[in-house]
Amino acid sequence: MHIDNVVFMKKVLDASAFINGYVPEGRENYTVRSVTEEIRDFRSMMILEDALREGRLKITEPDPESMKVVEDAISESGDIMRLSPTDMEVIGLAVSLRGKDDVTVITDDYTIQNTLKILGIGFRSVLTSGIRDTYSWRRVCTGCRRVYPLDYEFEECEICGSRIVRKRHRN
Protein backbone atom coordinates (compact mmCIF):
# COMPACT_ATOMS: atom_id res chain seq x y z
CA MET A 1 0.00 0.00 0.00
CA HIS A 2 1.49 3.37 -1.02
CA ILE A 3 0.59 6.46 1.02
CA ASP A 4 2.63 9.13 -0.74
CA ASN A 5 5.36 9.61 -3.31
CA VAL A 6 7.85 11.15 -0.90
CA VAL A 7 10.09 8.17 -0.08
CA PHE A 8 12.79 10.28 1.61
CA MET A 9 10.58 11.93 4.23
CA LYS A 10 10.92 10.45 7.71
CA LYS A 11 7.87 8.45 8.69
CA VAL A 12 6.89 7.28 12.16
CA LEU A 13 4.57 4.27 12.19
CA ASP A 14 2.15 3.30 14.92
CA ALA A 15 0.60 -0.15 15.30
CA SER A 16 -2.44 0.74 13.18
CA ALA A 17 -0.16 1.33 10.19
CA PHE A 18 1.05 -2.29 10.26
CA ILE A 19 -2.35 -3.71 11.23
CA ASN A 20 -4.01 -1.90 8.31
CA GLY A 21 -1.44 -3.15 5.80
CA TYR A 22 0.96 -0.23 5.35
CA VAL A 23 4.27 -1.47 3.90
CA PRO A 24 7.18 0.89 4.69
CA GLU A 25 9.14 2.05 1.64
CA GLY A 26 12.57 3.66 1.56
CA ARG A 27 14.89 3.74 4.56
CA GLU A 28 13.46 6.56 6.68
CA ASN A 29 10.75 4.65 8.60
CA TYR A 30 10.75 4.56 12.38
CA THR A 31 8.74 3.10 15.23
CA VAL A 32 9.14 2.50 18.96
CA ARG A 33 9.77 -0.89 20.59
CA SER A 34 6.36 -0.90 22.30
CA VAL A 35 4.62 -0.76 18.89
CA THR A 36 6.36 -4.00 17.89
CA GLU A 37 4.98 -5.60 21.06
CA GLU A 38 1.41 -4.64 20.06
CA ILE A 39 1.61 -6.46 16.70
CA ARG A 40 0.02 -9.88 17.08
CA ASP A 41 -1.60 -10.93 13.80
CA PHE A 42 0.43 -12.87 11.24
CA ARG A 43 0.16 -10.44 8.31
CA SER A 44 1.16 -7.41 10.36
CA MET A 45 4.02 -9.37 11.95
CA MET A 46 5.32 -10.32 8.48
CA ILE A 47 5.21 -6.69 7.29
CA LEU A 48 7.07 -5.60 10.43
CA GLU A 49 9.70 -8.37 10.32
CA ASP A 50 10.35 -7.92 6.57
CA ALA A 51 10.81 -4.16 6.99
CA LEU A 52 13.24 -4.68 9.90
CA ARG A 53 15.21 -7.39 8.10
CA GLU A 54 15.47 -5.36 4.88
CA GLY A 55 16.52 -2.18 6.70
CA ARG A 56 13.35 -0.26 5.81
CA LEU A 57 12.36 0.22 9.46
CA LYS A 58 14.35 1.42 12.47
CA ILE A 59 13.32 1.02 16.09
CA THR A 60 14.25 3.98 18.26
CA GLU A 61 12.90 5.78 21.29
CA PRO A 62 11.94 9.44 21.84
CA ASP A 63 14.15 11.70 23.92
CA PRO A 64 12.90 12.93 27.34
CA GLU A 65 12.50 16.53 26.14
CA SER A 66 10.17 15.40 23.35
CA MET A 67 8.12 13.34 25.79
CA LYS A 68 7.72 16.45 27.96
CA VAL A 69 6.39 18.37 24.92
CA VAL A 70 3.87 15.56 24.33
CA GLU A 71 2.82 15.38 27.99
CA ASP A 72 2.22 19.14 28.10
CA ALA A 73 0.16 19.08 24.88
CA ILE A 74 -2.03 16.13 25.87
CA SER A 75 -2.57 17.47 29.39
CA GLU A 76 -3.86 20.72 27.94
CA SER A 77 -6.06 19.09 25.27
CA GLY A 78 -7.37 16.31 27.52
CA ASP A 79 -6.06 13.60 25.20
CA ILE A 80 -3.99 12.32 28.12
CA MET A 81 -7.07 10.34 29.16
CA ARG A 82 -7.31 8.60 25.77
CA LEU A 83 -3.69 7.88 24.77
CA SER A 84 -1.76 4.80 25.82
CA PRO A 85 1.91 5.00 26.81
CA THR A 86 2.77 3.52 23.38
CA ASP A 87 0.73 6.22 21.62
CA MET A 88 2.59 8.88 23.61
CA GLU A 89 5.94 7.34 22.63
CA VAL A 90 4.97 7.35 18.94
CA ILE A 91 4.08 11.05 19.15
CA GLY A 92 7.24 11.70 21.18
CA LEU A 93 9.36 10.03 18.50
CA ALA A 94 7.78 12.25 15.85
CA VAL A 95 8.62 15.31 17.98
CA SER A 96 12.22 14.04 18.37
CA LEU A 97 12.66 13.51 14.63
CA ARG A 98 10.88 16.72 13.64
CA GLY A 99 13.78 18.83 14.87
CA LYS A 100 15.99 17.39 12.15
CA ASP A 101 13.73 16.90 9.12
CA ASP A 102 10.14 16.78 7.94
CA VAL A 103 8.30 13.92 9.57
CA THR A 104 4.92 12.31 8.92
CA VAL A 105 3.21 9.85 11.25
CA ILE A 106 1.34 6.96 9.62
CA THR A 107 -1.68 6.26 11.85
CA ASP A 108 -5.42 5.67 11.72
CA ASP A 109 -5.79 6.57 15.42
CA TYR A 110 -7.90 9.75 15.68
CA THR A 111 -6.58 10.71 19.12
CA ILE A 112 -2.98 10.46 17.92
CA GLN A 113 -3.95 12.53 14.86
CA ASN A 114 -5.59 15.15 17.09
CA THR A 115 -2.43 15.54 19.17
CA LEU A 116 -0.22 15.62 16.06
CA LYS A 117 -2.37 18.34 14.53
CA ILE A 118 -2.12 20.39 17.74
CA LEU A 119 1.68 19.97 17.65
CA GLY A 120 1.88 20.87 13.95
CA ILE A 121 3.16 17.44 12.86
CA GLY A 122 1.91 15.87 9.64
CA PHE A 123 0.09 12.56 9.50
CA ARG A 124 -1.35 10.19 6.94
CA SER A 125 -4.03 7.55 7.38
CA VAL A 126 -3.98 4.10 5.84
CA LEU A 127 -7.69 3.18 5.82
CA THR A 128 -9.54 6.14 7.33
CA SER A 129 -10.02 9.65 6.02
CA GLY A 130 -8.28 11.16 9.06
CA ILE A 131 -9.38 14.11 11.16
CA ARG A 132 -10.18 17.60 9.88
CA ASP A 133 -10.54 19.55 13.14
CA THR A 134 -8.78 19.43 16.50
CA TYR A 135 -10.62 18.80 19.73
CA SER A 136 -10.02 19.21 23.43
CA TRP A 137 -11.85 17.60 26.31
CA ARG A 138 -13.79 19.23 29.13
CA ARG A 139 -15.71 18.06 32.17
CA VAL A 140 -19.22 19.53 32.11
CA CYS A 141 -22.16 19.34 34.52
CA THR A 142 -25.18 17.73 32.84
CA GLY A 143 -27.52 20.01 34.82
CA CYS A 144 -26.24 23.57 35.01
CA ARG A 145 -23.52 23.14 32.30
CA ARG A 146 -20.73 24.42 34.54
CA VAL A 147 -17.31 23.57 33.06
CA TYR A 148 -14.79 21.92 35.39
CA PRO A 149 -11.07 21.30 34.88
CA LEU A 150 -10.13 17.85 33.59
CA ASP A 151 -8.51 16.96 36.90
CA TYR A 152 -11.65 17.78 38.92
CA GLU A 153 -11.98 14.66 41.05
CA PHE A 154 -15.68 14.60 41.91
CA GLU A 155 -18.46 13.03 39.85
CA GLU A 156 -21.18 15.45 40.98
CA CYS A 157 -21.50 19.20 40.42
CA GLU A 158 -20.79 21.35 43.46
CA ILE A 159 -23.48 23.83 42.30
CA CYS A 160 -26.50 21.68 41.41
CA GLY A 161 -25.48 18.11 42.29
CA SER A 162 -25.94 16.75 38.76
CA ARG A 163 -23.54 14.29 37.16
CA ILE A 164 -20.32 15.59 35.54
CA VAL A 165 -19.32 14.06 32.20
CA ARG A 166 -16.42 14.45 29.78
CA LYS A 167 -17.34 16.22 26.54
CA ARG A 168 -15.39 16.82 23.39
CA HIS A 169 -14.97 20.47 22.39
CA ARG A 170 -13.94 21.64 18.91
CA ASN A 171 -11.01 24.06 19.09
UniProtKB/Swiss-Prot annotation:
Zn(2+) binds at residues 141, 144, 157, 160. Transmembrane segments: none annotated. Keywords: Endonuclease, Hydrolase, Manganese, Metal-binding, Nuclease, Ribosome biogenesis, RNA-binding, rRNA-binding, Toxin-antitoxin system, Zinc. GO terms for biological process: maturation of SSU-rRNA. Signal peptide: none annotated. The keyword Mitochondrion does not apply. Gene3D superfamilies: 5'-nuclease. Binds 1 zinc ion per subunit. The keyword Electron transport does not apply. Residues 130-135 are annotated as: Flexible linker. Its cofactor is Mn(2+); Zn(2+). Mn(2+) binds at residues 14, 133. InterPro entries: NOB1, PIN_dom, Ribonuclease_PIN, VapC_family. Residues 136-171 are annotated as: Zinc ribbon. Residues 9-114 form the PINc domain. Its EC number is 3.1.-.-. GO terms for cellular component: preribosome, small subunit precursor. Belongs to the PINc/VapC protein family. Has 2 structurally independent domains; the N-terminal PINc domain which binds Mn(2+), rRNA substrate and probably has endoribonuclease activity, and the C-terminal zinc ribbon domain which also binds rRNA substrate. Toxic component of a type II toxin-antitoxin (TA) system. Processes pre-16S-rRNA at its 3' end (the D-site) to yield the mature 3' end. This is Endoribonuclease Nob1. It comes from Methanothermobacter thermautotrophicus (strain ATCC 29096 / DSM 1053 / JCM 10044 / NBRC 100330 / Delta H) (Methanobacterium thermoautotrophicum).
